[in-house]
Amino acid sequence: MNAVGFAWRSLVRQPARAALGVLGVAAVGALLLDMLLLSRGLVVSMQDLLDRGGWDIRVGAGELPGTVRIPNALEAAQTIAELPSVRAALVIRSATAQIDRSSGPPLRVSFQGVTTRTASRANSALRAPWTIMRGRDAERPNEIVVDNGIATEAGLAPGSEVTLRASCVADVEALPATRLQVVGIAEFPFEATNEHTAGGTFDALAAACGGNVGEEADLILVTSMGDADGTAAAIRAVAPGLRAATNSEVVGRLQQTSFSYFRQISSVLTTVTVSFAVLLIAVLLTVSVNQRLGEIAALRALGFSRTRVVKDVLSESALIVGTGGLLSLPLGLALASGLDRILKGMPGIPAALHFFVFEPQALAVHAALLVATAIVAALYPMRIVSRLPIAATLRDEVIG
């Protein structure tokens, strides 16, 4: 019988201890997998979210795009759009708004007004930063699209009319009432879980604000001809008062600031979980070996080599960790899904952003750490059996 088969029989003879080890590794392995998914989850998810719309450069007035409003944004967007390496530029201006309902208080929403600037007539069509789910996109000053939450709570559908009161200057100003037609239900990628968003053209926003919208904007999205880094440098040259950043640069800045906390938490908890797994398996194997010292000495006397009994102990560790590791995969993915829903409920977190993102490299690191755990946890028990004095142990067994 080979070492693995012999180790399996040893574990079957002690089902309670084996089950404790397997369940412990499964729990630790699930948490370990989640920490590995969390370590790069936000970075991968944010990169995908930024790239999804096709805009590879973001232009703003602050350190991070969208934090400070851009003065003379329409003029700046036109200047940017005339660069040879720019395909199109999209100006986004947000305003606080309320949508009246037939029953209940008004819905507080964020209204995004957008307009396209381009030097090419072929690229002049509006490319909104949202995805139409039902109906069509808003094209006229009296048309808007709303998210599914607004449609559900206000009982709206494509073709419905709403009374919207927008505030483009300050939240304390009197909100004028404007009748607009809902032409589509849209998905807004950066909308938070507990927020509502509506969208339309820049002219629709100006109409909703009674013309009091000004020339400021929150963000300018730019699509390059292919060279995002070179285009960002060209934008910084023609608009020195603005900050242009590629999607990768935006993610890099977030990784150094907002996302660094989760990476640190992931590293600490990964170290703790691996250490706990090593201690758990080492204790279980040591107790098992100490209870079977007489049996192991007898096997050595019958001809089992030192290498063979060491392999038996290592095989026991591998079976416990391997079985627990396999169980930890579905358990870890289920736990990650639940934790992701909880964390996405925090204020200001886009609903499309995920904290836990599966990557093949995370699975490879997970497997490597479990293999290392099985080996390290078995070192002390293997040392015990390798140095076991056969004659003295058998004599103690007979006397005892």
Region locations from a protein language model:
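N-terminal Sec/SRP start-transfer signal
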Residues: 1-31, 43, 256, 311, ...
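Short beta-strand boundary microenvironments
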Residues: 110-154
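Short helix-loop junctions at transmembrane helix boundaries
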Residues: 326-368, 379-388, 392
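Peri-transmembrane interface segments
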Residues: 42, 230-279, 288-290, 299, ...
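Hydrophobic, regular-secondary-structure patches
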Residues: 29-110, 128, 134-137, 233-238, ...
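Transmembrane alpha-helical interface segments in multi-pass membrane proteins
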Residues: 273, 286-288, 294-340, 365, ...
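Short helix-to-coil transition segments within interhelical loops
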Residues: 11, 300-308, 388, 397
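Basic-flanked hydrophobic alpha-helices used for secretion and membrane insertion
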Residues: 131, 136, 149-245
